[in-house]
Amino acid sequence: MSSVVVVGTQWGDEGKGKITDFLSKKADVVARYQGGDNAGHTIVFNNETYKLHLIPSGIFYSDKKCVIGNGLVVNPKSLVKELKYLHDRGVSTDNLLISNRAHVILPYHQLQDQLEEEAKGDAKVGTTLKGIGPCYMDKAARIGIRMADLLDKETFAEKLKIVLEQKNRMFTKMYDAEAIAFDDIFEEYYAYGQEFAKYVCDTSVVVNDSLDKGEKVLFEGAQGVLLDLDHGTYPFVTSSNASAGGVASGVGVGPARIDHVVGVCKAYTSRVGDGPFPTELFDEIGHQIREVGREYGTTTGRPRRVGWFDSVVVRHSRRTSGLTDLSLNSIDVLTGIETLKICTSYEFNGKQIDEYPASFRDLEACVPVYEELPGWKEDITHIRKFEDLPINAQNYVKRIADLTGISLVTFSVGPGREQTVVLRDLYEEA
């Protein structure tokens, strides 16, 4: 058995898709375990760039099973659109598998998302308005509609009528919005379900059978630990468990079956949306990092907020996700910056703290404590060995590994797969 989890250690957008795609080469199964189409990942394959939101990165390898696990919430319309996007570019999806227990996002979830966000005013969380949160709410309230329901016309109709009655009461009475008609959803979304029905199965059985056979399984996370419902900067978080703990429940495997947990981070920090960000940069350096790093959301197109590397954040992720290995991306983006800074701790109420506060108000009051390191000017995008990096770049990477307490397994000096340098083979170690 050999299984590896890839998890973001910051606020998402760390380059997980790139690393997952890279690790997919040796995997037999690639499985997503949480989230929905609110998070995107960009993959460069055969010199072409693809942007995916739901389908796992391993889809480009026809010999690998690609699993959308039960922990995801799936928008059927988005899924059909993404399947067409791949088919139009000559990519087969015959290797895709979708859990029959995954919950389905329907138009009323998106409307609810929009109305709730508008009602919050200045206290809004900054949701992508994709209906993710409301769908997870229905799941917890036990009124959700799952893939197995969507594919059965009678069951889908029965459940949809019940849920719409509740939702429309809320829309009209609480928000003074228009009701959604049954006919506006039913036939269209039932038809979507029929388009991908051939992919739907009990994916927990598939993944566990693969592990029993000794096959290599890669679990692909979305977002990052700081957006995790329990361990993130609550309430500025997503509605699922983006930490490694989400794998067990989101795919249906026992936690003892996980061998490695790879934490992915950038050589700096970024986030989309509202919420505390202690090391955020508002100056010319921040602008440079954003433009050089193309820091714009894959899903929303929104400019990302950027800042210095925060070791407090990544240590928090190490503890809560049990990180065993570190994958460091986008080192090349920092080229040309004369002096680099790494946050080593926070100052809060006159005291130095090393752990991440639970209260977002406390976090907003934290002042980062920085350590400065000299930068480098040399172009490093062609580097393929750690020892070939400029000495200042080597020292910067080593300091990140030291401060986070995580052993480096890969680093990247550009967006291409060939620009990822592997220091150890995780599958051989498992």
Swiss-Prot record:
Catalytic reaction(s) noted: IMP + L-aspartate + GTP = N(6)-(1,2-dicarboxyethyl)-AMP + GDP + phosphate + 2 H(+)
Pfam families: Adenylsucc_synt
Predominant location category: cytoplasm
Any one Gene Ontology BP term: IMP metabolic process
Gene behind the chain: purA
Cofactor(s) needed for function: Mg(2+)
Any one GO molecular function term: adenylosuccinate synthase activity
Listed Gene3D superfamilies: Adenylosuccinate Synthetase, subunit A, domain 1, Adenylosuccinate Synthetase, subunit A, domain 2, Adenylosuccinate Synthetase, subunit A, domain 3
Natural source organism: Exiguobacterium sibiricum (strain DSM 17290 / CCUG 55495 / CIP 109462 / JCM 13490 / 255-15)
Co-factor note (free text): Binds 1 Mg(2+) ion per subunit.
Name of the protein in question: Adenylosuccinate synthetase
Quaternary structure and partners: Homodimer.
Positions annotated as active site in the UniProt record: D13 (proton acceptor), H41 (proton donor)
NCBIfam families from the UniProt entry: PRK01117.1, purA
Pathway: Purine metabolism; AMP biosynthesis via de novo pathway; AMP from IMP: step 1/2
Function according to Swiss-Prot or TrEMBL: Plays an important role in the de novo pathway of purine nucleotide biosynthesis. Catalyzes the first committed step in the biosynthesis of AMP from IMP.
Chain positions recorded as IMP binding sites: D13, E14, G15, K16, N38, A39, G40, H41, T128, R142, Q223, T238, R302
Entry superkingdom: Bacteria
CDD domains, A to Z: AdSS
One Gene Ontology CC term in the entry: cytoplasm
Alphabetized UniProt keyword annotations: Cytoplasm, GTP-binding, Ligase, Magnesium, Metal-binding, Nucleotide-binding, Purine biosynthesis
